[in-house]
């Protein structure tokens, strides 16, 4: 953590988006703490620069896989910092984050994936990967987990 804050391939979508505010705060607040999480009893902290770097890397990975403006991104995971970074990464590319309950059974997700025409999904763990692999043949657009 702690490299370059902005990637020139990320479009500027305006001052009022979550991703734009993260990048602006990274420039203004840099090393100051942006978010903290207690994991296994130990507090973890990320600076604004760290968060912007994570969001930029996620956005770069999504873009490399073909994620473009207007795409919907399913996000399935615990209520943790990386989940929110996925929201911002999607929005930084002009995409739409679609959060889904991680405890939903696979069959319950099929409708959402098809109705929202979701092509991409970011998931927290192997359990969620397995769930999506199980329903992938029934999800008309899903192509990247």
Language-model features and meaning:
Residues 64, 92-145:
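Structural core segment of the AMP-binding/adenylate-forming
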């Amino acid at each position: 953590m702690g490299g370059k804050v902005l990637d020139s391939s990320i479009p500027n979508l305006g001052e009022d988006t979550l991703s734009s505010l993260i990048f602006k705060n990274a420039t203004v607040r840099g090393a100051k703490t942006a978010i903290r999480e207690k994991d296994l009893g130990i507090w973890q902290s990320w600076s604004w620069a760290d968060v912007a770097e994570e969001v930029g890397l996620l956005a770069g990975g999504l873009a490399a896989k073909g994620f473009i403006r207007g795409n919907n991104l399913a996000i399935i995971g615990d209520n943790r910092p990386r989940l929110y970074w996925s929201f911002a990464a999607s929005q930084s590319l002009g995409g739409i984050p679609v959060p889904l309950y991680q405890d939903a059974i696979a069959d319950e997700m099929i409708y959402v994936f098809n109705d929202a025409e979701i092509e991409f999904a970011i998931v927290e763990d192997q359990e969620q990967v397995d769930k999506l692999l199980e329903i992938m043949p029934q999800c008309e657009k899903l192509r990247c987990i």
